[in-house]
From Swiss-Prot:
The gene is SPK1. The modification Phosphoserine is found at S1051, S1095. It is a peripheral membrane protein. The modification N-acetylmethionine is found at M1. Residues 1379-1828 form the DOCKER domain. The keyword Nucleus applies. This is Guanine nucleotide exchange factor SPIKE 1. It holds the Pfam family DHR-2_Lobe_C. It comes from Arabidopsis thaliana.
Amino acid sequence: MENNNLGLRFRKLPRQPLALPKLDPLLDENLEQWPHLNQLVQCYGTEWVKDVNKYGHYENIRPDSFQTQIFEGPDTDTETEIRLASARSATIEEDVASISGRPFSDPGSSKHFGQPPLPAYEPAFDWENERAMIFGQRTPESPAASYSSGLKISVRVLSLAFQSGLVEPFFGSIALYNQERKEKLSEDFYFQIQPTEMQDAKLSSENRGVFYLDAPSASVCLLIQLEKTATEEGGVTSSVYSRKEPVHLTEREKQKLQVWSRIMPYRESFAWAVVPLFDNNLTTNTGESASPSSPLAPSMTASSSHDGVYEPIAKITSDGKQGYSGGSSVVVEISNLNKVKESYSEESIQDPKRKVHKPVKGVLRLEIEKHRNGHGDFEDLSENGSIINDSLDPTDRLSDLTLMKCPSSSSGGPRNGCSKWNSEDAKDVSRNLTSSCGTPDLNCYHAFDFCSTTRNEPFLHLFHCLYVYPVAVTLSRKRNPFIRVELRKDDTDIRKQPLEAIYPREPGVSLQKWVHTQVAVGARAASYHDEIKVSLPATWTPSHHLLFTFFHVDLQTKLEAPRPVVVGYASLPLSTYIHSRSDISLPVMRELVPHYLQESTKERLDYLEDGKNIFKLRLRLCSSLYPTNERVRDFCLEYDRHTLQTRPPWGSELLQAINSLKHVDSTALLQFLYPILNMLLHLIGNGGETLQVAAFRAMVDILTRVQQVSFDDADRNRFLVTYVDYSFDDFGGNQPPVYPGLATVWGSLARSKAKGYRVGPVYDDVLSMAWFFLELIVKSMALEQARLYDHNLPTGEDVPPMQLKESVFRCIMQLFDCLLTEVHERCKKGLSLAKRLNSSLAFFCYDLLYIIEPCQVYELVSLYMDKFSGVCQSVLHECKLTFLQIISDHDLFVEMPGRDPSDRNYLSSILIQELFLSLDHDELPLRAKGARILVILLCKHEFDARYQKAEDKLYIAQLYFPFVGQILDEMPVFYNLNATEKREVLIGVLQIVRNLDDTSLVKAWQQSIARTRLYFKLMEECLILFEHKKAADSILGGNNSRGPVSEGAGSPKYSERLSPAINNYLSEASRQEVRLEGTPDNGYLWQRVNSQLASPSQPYSLREALAQAQSSRIGASAQALRESLHPILRQKLELWEENVSATVSLQVLEITENFSSMAASHNIATDYGKLDCITTILTSFFSRNQSLAFWKAFFPIFNRIFDLHGATLMARENDRFLKQIAFHLLRLAVYRNDSVRKRAVIGLQILVKSSLYFMQTARLRALLTITLSELMSDVQVTHMKSDNTLEESGEARRLQQSLSEMADEAKSVNLLRECGLPDDTLLIIPEKFTENRWSWAEVKHLSDSLVLALDASLGHALLGSVMAMDRYAAAESFYKLGMAFAPVPDLHIMWLLHLCDAHQEMQSWAEAAQCAVAVAGVIMQALVARNDGVWSKDHVSALRKICPMVSGEFTTEASAAEVEGYGASKLTVDSAVKYLQLANKLFSQAELYHFCASILELVIPVYKSRKAYGQLAKCHTLLTNIYESILDQESNPIPFIDATYYRVGFYGEKFGKLDRKEYVYREPRDVRLGDIMEKLSHIYESRMDSNHILHIIPDSRQVKAEDLQAGVCYLQITAVDAVMEDEDLGSRRERIFSLSTGSVRARVFDRFLFDTPFTKNGKTQGGLEDQWKRRTVLQTEGSFPALVNRLLVTKSESLEFSPVENAIGMIETRTTALRNELEEPRSSDGDHLPRLQSLQRILQGSVAVQVNSGVLSVCTAFLSGEPATRLRSQELQQLIAALLEFMAVCKRAIRVHFRLIGEEDQEFHTQLVNGFQSLTAELSHYIPAILSEL
């Protein structure tokens, strides 16, 4: 296996991860005569063989960062904020980079709009973790980790210091010791400490001892024993080190000690100490649940016996910087060593009061470091193929955990060590550590762990030695005894040298012939504490023995160095005592003679102390070669005989030995498991049928027991996994492979079962252990395949698949079939064994794909699929899914051929079929599982570095593309999924489609129109399900009422839009948070000096508690869970969600663009009449919350789509689509973010351009007006100011700006460039057109129309709460809305009806009636324009006379611009008649009967055309009543007044738009001047603030700006009179209406006047001679009655009349009134009462003589004295003529009055005659001619 090719498939791993010397040179001898030993040595000694393909491949692509996606709202501008923040701080990039995501090495990304959606959906994809969730998933085991799962502790001696000074060398040993059980747990680690002046560079003072421990325990401690040179008699005694008072050695004493230590080779016990390692109150677990603050031996720091001091030291990496390590080290100062006063024993170690031993005045400093003995150790070793002393030396690099393919190896990332340096010594430590990094193996001694010989674990390494512990020798007198120990082969020749089998204490020295113990100085009962390690031979005879020689040495310096004297000998035969664990007592011989072991010789020997057993010792055998169990030894012996064929081949002894293996105790069975399995496999491969079956049955029994006795619950026992994965090598190719024999014997057993034979309970055991045999068969095949092509394969080429022999393959097929049958039958019974067996069969096929011809694997897979075909029970279907998921994870799965040579993708097609069946399954968990499998497989392809080429991605996409077809064929299946499953399917569809080429993709759109529609339904679902919403808006459950079934009930759900795996990832991350600093891993049961590190910081623990509390609550909200996350995790989550939404939208946009291009060439099947696929997806884009990146990519595509398909998209059939697009473009035009807003403007221009070419602009105006109206209810156009008044909002301003920019030719080019469109986008002429129809004037007209509608809506909104109080403003607002939305008849009518209702509430009947007439007019005009009504243009003109607002300007266009849901389709004759009747009713209430008549005349033609005679009768009855009412009004002596009119002027800034404007108000006839003053004061006082007051100007004079005060708002209210159409406004007469003046005229007024008297002499008042008059005529914007109560004064003219003209006018006015009364015709002569009353009233006011009143006052003023001289002659003559005419008419009236009166009025008539005569007499004084005239 030294060649490269074998290494392509298998990796050789060194077996021995420990740096130990070569164990036994005796093993080099020839072992051919002991085949079982050969097996053992080969099992332990050869390198492991690891199949690198077995657990799959996955090479993750380079991690990359997600881009922050910006999702803007109407009032946000995150883009600008981020840009400004970036400008302020350059470090923000580093922060963003820390939130990394999945890489996007998308080779074809240039043709794509965005990154693929899958990485954002699965940002934390963990291939190993996903595989681990498969039922029956096999996970790799690391052998070293699986057997030493506890702790590794390293100890290094730093220094030894005494109060009296360190002069002589000291030696010592350290071992792990269990105080409770009083036993050593490890062998000794030796060290020595030389005085400074005696140090030698070669001494290993830097040595480090490494100890292994299963689990922390309070009783585990370090036992430290110190030795020094045996004390010289009469020399300096060891008591100098323990005296209480300070002792200082003299120079002579120091010299003497140094000389003595050099010549004396023997040592004595000096002191000892016990150092507890762990807390007293900890539990004996393996550490995961231990408290992170558990200290390392608090007794060291606080106990009375060991006043130790702890100092954390920093880890130093090889570059000198502080680094990270899995370990933590402490420096321990042991200040109280116990001096050995006399021989001590284990009991004295337990003595708590230290009565026997004095304390030594010295300090021993140790550095103790712990390491997790985890997977990293072994992997570091195995991946590099060489032994590395990992993490023992802190200067070594960290174990590369990422090399592990085992998910359990992740321990939460690097951990911080303590970085504080506490002393100079710590620096020395670091210096020493650094200096030792060159040869780490030489400086570490791995002490053998005695527990490894008693654990229920297989032996992995070769160890074969005996530990000898001399305990005591009891002599009759005091001596200085010590013992020499040696191993001899026999006792024949006592002069023969012993075997070199004793391990030395010094490192790096070869095995020695003997070793000496300590000297027990002056002892009668000498005790020893030595540990002697003896290397044993591979096999031993009864003559192999240990020989102990006892010496006495004189401890005095004479002429030469002291020589020891032999005292006696003792021997111990190995074969007799090798198994003994208790104390052994031996007699001591005085002399040694040949054959001293033989019983006959022993009788002649002379013994010390009368032959008593005075020598006591202990033995500890540690061997992985020599089984202590007798049955195992018997099996080995019979195996040897069978192999060497020393017995007949049918030997029943071997069968018996094989069968007896089932009775071996579990410990022995486990310890020798691997060699036993190897030997049984050898028998299965090479033995006869009987032997094969026996060996197979024994093997099954052993495997079952191993599975039962191991303490883990895994389906695949870790010991067996290690055997298959590492240890099993199929005999290194030296023997035929195992798999044919194994398959044969197993297959025969299976077939026997299938035939119904009784095969015993062993068969069920075979099934439960089937995974083991299947993996053995596979590895055996793989090894054979590798060796077959070992030498003839060019370097670097893949090993070709191996064609199995027909017989072997048939056997495997039969076996597979039998096992399948078992799965099928047992699944139906619901047995979990069936599921495990199913997974094992899947992995069997998975493995075979690497080894044998895929066609042969196809046979197995198709056999499986035939057995499980179609829809089956949920348990069976789940098994089938698991089977497919396992095989599909294979690297070669895309190449697996079928039976037909053209069928290269059998597996992918069957996978797609079964996944779809899963989605359609009744069982909800199976749906979730099917969807999940799809995503996981796609993730593996997408994120695997080996599949990044474009052709690979295309090939994989083509393989999966039929899945999209399946979905389209069975859409109800998709709709029946819940939201989570839908997302899984859709993300898979998007990923598949993304990597497809256009040729493949177009196939999905070529089959049928319905199928293409369904495809885009899927795209719509993508946009819906992945829409980005705020976390607060998300709901815990999906769209479907049932939640995702794939997750456990306790699994919290942080996000809906991301993969379900993310929830587990975040849950785990939340739990790990608390470990970020000061975790159980970092402070694993070790002392923390810094109390702040003893527990995690508060926020972390609070967050973790909250997360746990939230996850434990049923139905905890996703928002609460998100809040419980660490901010970094929450930021990651939001980033991922933003990206998945953005990437999905961009991907759908990319698909839409492709579709649009294909549709242009008519290559696909779609509805070319409407292009509904494009319209629905575009609408869906707009209606979802999209990222800024999307909008930037969208509008060029939007423009391209309208260029290609403008004619279709702008057709009437797509009105609904256009309306929605227009709505969303206007909505985006409101956005604060300029990038979005400007693109919306471009979108509107694109729509306008298309309308100019493909439709009427009027239709687009109607569309945009409609959408603007709808938008007003969505957008907040006002906001409250601090003074609680409303003002225009930013949204409204931005919309106004956007509508203006739409028509701004100057900004157009820059706008297009900013949005990534060509400069001439708007000028490009579409195909089939020759002229450029783009017109900025048209766009401007459209823009102005929309701005008008916006202003009206804004004005209406700004009224707000004022509307209820200020009914005038409210009505005006409704009116403006009605006019602004006139392009849309429905909206126009809606606002007019609102206005009508408002007027009715105010009882303004005439105005309400006008609204109804206007509505009817809109409908009538539309009907006339369509020529489908009963009316003509003459009727419209008649209606316009009633309501001049009825105009043809808008409605002609609007009737043509019908939009779906709006427009002329709802305008019918019936609705017009309805509103005409409403107007008739309202005019009746207003008593304007002449309007009622006109309206009924418009209704009558309708009934005539329909021959509705009943209705006609009613109409004529109504007309009769109306004309009678008109007659009543005319015959009433009191003139009929329908309304009063008032001029109101507004002056003041608080009036806003009303400031400096005048209005004429139309009020009910009973409203007087005081009433309207009060009403308006009430309205406008509420609008004043503390800085403004309201003032009413009391007169009607002209207001001058300089007269107005700041802070005062003025109202000027004046009563005005309506002016008739033909009235002479220049007449000086006073205006007194009688019935005769307007009886037959329509009461429609648009001019008004009022007269204002004034003087020119400065006086406020004067006589008639000074009284001038100003007549003001006002022209209003429209005519009354109007749609509103007030109209703006557009024109104001004034006339002035002199005082005499005033007087003449007054007289002429009275004359005319009287003459009119005399000449008025009456209906009958008898009807004289009204006339009499009217005549009496006029005469009484004309001829009653009163001082300074009437006619007489005029004469007095102008015809007497000085004023008469000022009159011009013409004026004088006019005045006299007027007076004479007046008197003549009065005389005539008196005569008429006499004819009309009765008796009762005679007295009144007499008064009139007297008054006339008196008046004539008075006037004659001024006008003498009057007497003659009358």
